Amino acid sequence: FSIMGDWAKGEFTAAGKKPGVDYYCAATPSNNGYLYNVDSFIFYKTNDPDKQAGQKLLAKLMMGKNFQKVFNLYKGSIPARLDVPMDEFDSCAKTSNSDIKTAGAKGGLVPSFAHGMAQGNTMKAALQDVITEHFNSDMSSKDAANALADSVLQNM
């Protein structure tokens, strides 16, 4: 049993594995929200008109419906755009796409803690220290919760 992100699905697909047969997809840790992580591309500031035009073209192409479809079919994830038709996607992607739309409408989108989308590195390190201590010692859950709250306050 393993919990993986949708990035693993691209590898499963490349290996000829089928969702619902060789592996299963489910929201984790629950179906009340949607934990997300997004890949980002950063364009450095430039005064060169040719470079600016290239940056704009790359951004336009990457966010195009066709690129989003093809890229995500191979990667195993879902498009960043919500208006990309999902008819060629498998059941896992269709469910994930539906889940993100539902969570977004209900305010249930949760940024990834592990990938720095929810907080900066200082806060993440402080919280991980408490979590590590809790799981590797006799620290009670109540004490861990209090220590987490203290860490947040100290690192805001």
Where do the PLM segments sit?
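Structured segments of extracytoplasmic/periplasmic soluble domains
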Residues: A15, L61-K65, Y74, V130-D138, ...
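N-terminal alpha-helical segment
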Residues: Y36-N37, G54, M123-L127
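Short amphipathic alpha-helical coupling segments at ligand-binding clamshell hinges
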Residues: P49-M62, A144
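A residue-level marker of the well-folded mature domains of exported/periplasmic proteins
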Residues: D6, A14, K18, Y44-D50, ...
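Periplasmic-binding protein-like
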Residues: A59-P85
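Alpha-helical elements of the RecA-like P-loop NTPase motor core of helicases
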Residues: G10, K69, A125
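C-terminal capping/gating helix-and-loop segments adjacent to ligand/active sites or protein-protein/ligand interfaces
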Residues: A80, V84, S98-V152
